[in-house]
A protein has these predicted regions:
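Small/flexible residues
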Residues: 4-5, 117, 154-156
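Acidic, serine/threonine-rich low-complexity disordered tracts
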Residues: 20-98, 143-237
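Hydrophobic, well-structured mid-protein blocks that either form specific transmembrane helices
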Residues: 94-136
């Protein structure tokens, strides 16, 4: 059950990070049973995300997580971050800002971390994929700031596929995301929400199907941890 909850939480936010400027809705399912829903909206330099439990999971593990990120529209480097998490009995708030004068990202009530101007987060990286042609980013490495830890990230273009969405066959780019930790980093938090804690899990296999340009929004995604695969599918294409 714990591994199942990890997968659900990871995919909920992972799927959110791909979308257009409209508010998009996604259903998340495991074994064909809906367990969560996602609301995502982005403006020019801001991303707002809400993930909610639904279906059977609402009865034994309700959650409502809000994430807000601002970023540089040229480099997609993080400028500010705020999250408010409620997962069962666990609650957490975290916020921080990037200081251009010191090139540090400082978390309120926590430490400061030296980060380059172009250092992204998982959310801004995925938003970048939403706005740019994945072929231009294929196999390239980028630094990722993640709650005080530094990672190297890359997307791998696995090919072009047709997937079925609401009865329509749509051509999409099939991507895989890799995240590799910098071993010199020490974890800032003893505990975090399931998404933040497990998106970097060494065993998680993250795959995304993004509609080919011009719209570029994500159509479907899957996250696999161990034997469990969770799938998210857009509902308001």
């Amino acid at each position: 059950m714990k591994r199942f909850l990890h997968c659900v939480s990871v995919l909920l936010l992972f799927e959110l990070a791909f979308s257009s400027t409209d508010t998009l809705h996604y259903d998340v399912t495991v074994f064909g049973i809906r367990c969560g829903k996602i609301f995502y909206s982005s403006e020019k330099e801001n991303i707002s995300i809400t993930a909610l439990s639904s279906g059977l999971i609402e009865y034994f593990y309700p959650f409502k997580n809000d994430y807000h990120t601002s970023f540089d529209t040229l480099t997609f480097g993080i400028r500010s971050y705020k999250k408010t998490v409620k997962q069962g009995d666990f609650k957490q708030r975290l916020s921080g800002k990037w200081d251009s004068s010191t090139e540090e990202f400082t978390y309120d009530n926590f430490d400061s971390f030296k980060r380059a101007d172009s250092c992204m987060t998982i959310f801004t990286l995925l938003e970048r994929l939403n706005r740019e042609n994945p072929e231009k980013l294929d196999t390239k490495w980028f630094p990722i700031e993640h709650e005080g830890s530094l990672y190297r990230s890359r997307v791998l273009l696995a090919g072009t596929e047709k997937i079925l969405i609401n009865g329509d066959s749509i051509v999409s780019n099939h991507l895989r995301l890799d995240l590799i930790p910098d071993d010199r980093e020490i974890k800032m938090l003893d505990r975090s929400d399931y998404f933040s804690q497990n998106i970097t899990h060494s065993e998680s296999i993250k795959q995304i199907w993004v509609e080919r340009k011009p719209s570029g929004k994500i159509l479907k995604a899957s996250v696999k941890i161990g034997p469990i695969t969770i799938t998210a599918t857009i509902t308001n294409k």
